Design a protein with these regions (language model features):
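FIC/Doc superfamily catalytic core
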Residues: 1-156
């Protein structure tokens, strides 16, 4: 593989480091808001980007919007902050960590938090077909094995 473009972009990024703390905080917050909004919108959440930002930044409740939509936003924020907390100590990615993230994201769904689904699902309008429930655990194991190998071989 030719990594010259990646190397050039990496060098440009390195030349801008370190980011000042206020800029880093602003970028992280902006990313969290947009990621939370888009991730939840895909799942049918009715909040707008602005409403999502208000919930995350001001802690407000949006009138006439379902409480589930608010909990989805808060759950994504908690999961995002948890993931950020794992970066500095360089915690290895494990099934336990993935389940914990899942548990945070599904804060309003106690019955399904942190566990693999037990029923088949379909995504309307999508070509992708999610795996059958009995395949999820072995596919997660394979994913984590592949991740470990790829991480050791990555060009960083």
């Amino acid at each position: 593989m030719n990594f010259s473009k990646i190397e050039a972009l990496k060098a440009e990024l390195q030349s801008r480091r370190p980011l000042n703390p206020s800029e880093l905080k602003r970028l992280r917050e902006e990313f969290m808001i947009e990621h939370t909004y888009h991730s939840n919108a895909i799942e049918g959440n009715t909040l707008t980007l602005r409403e999502t930002a208000l919930i995350l930044q001001e802690g407000v409740t949006i009138a006439e919007k379902p409480i589930k939509d608010h909990l989805d936003v808060i759950g994504y924020k908690d999961a995002f902050e948890y993931i950020i907390s794992l970066i500095a100590p360089e915690c290895p990615l494990t099934e336990s960590i993935i389940r914990q993230i899942h548990s945070l994201v599904l804060m309003d769904d106690a019955a399904n938090r942190g566990i693999y689904r037990s029923v088949p699902v379909r995504i309307l309008g999508a070509l992708h077909e999610p795996p059958q429930p009995y395949l999820i655990a072995p596919q997660m194991e394979a994913l984590l094995r592949d991740y470990t190998v790829q991480k050791q071989q990555m060009h960083i």
